[in-house]
Amino acid sequence: EEPGLLEKDLLAFLRKRRGILDGVCISGGEPLLHTGLSGLIREMKELGYLVKLDTNGSFPERLKRLVGEGLLDYVAMDIKNSKKKYAATAGVEAFQIEPVEESVRFLMEGNVPFEFRTTVVRELHSGEDIEEIGEWISGDEPYFLQSFEPSDHVPDLRLSAYGKEEMETLADILREKVPNVELRGL
């Protein structure tokens, strides 16, 4: 398997596409694992690109720094599950949810345009879990319920998606606390 693009190759690609592309989405894994991300984003911004960051919220201080430096135009943060099921859903037994909670609070303060999103898996998310997420992130922020899509990259073949009507029911549960809910991937 070939390694990913080197930073200089990525920047060369972006230089050639100025005026064609509007923005860059930095995704992962978890992009905030990389401590040198701000330098790369700064160069992207100098080229005139908008920058969106996809994150799981595990590194609130790094997120705050990037936002504070004006390097992010949009943040999409995954909410894996209700607080009580977060560790199991993330697949990390000793998962500490406090950093995620701090990132949620920071984004909800309105420091940068953002969305929350949850990829909904039948075996991991119940209606009660979805309701608890709604109580946690209650407000007018955009929240997307994304339908799970089985693939070769998902190690547990027993996982499955909810149907469209079921997803609509879950969205209705959320709308009491989070009116700006939309469905993706159906």
Regions found by a protein language model. Give the residues of each.
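Short, charge-patterned binding micro-sites
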Residues: 29
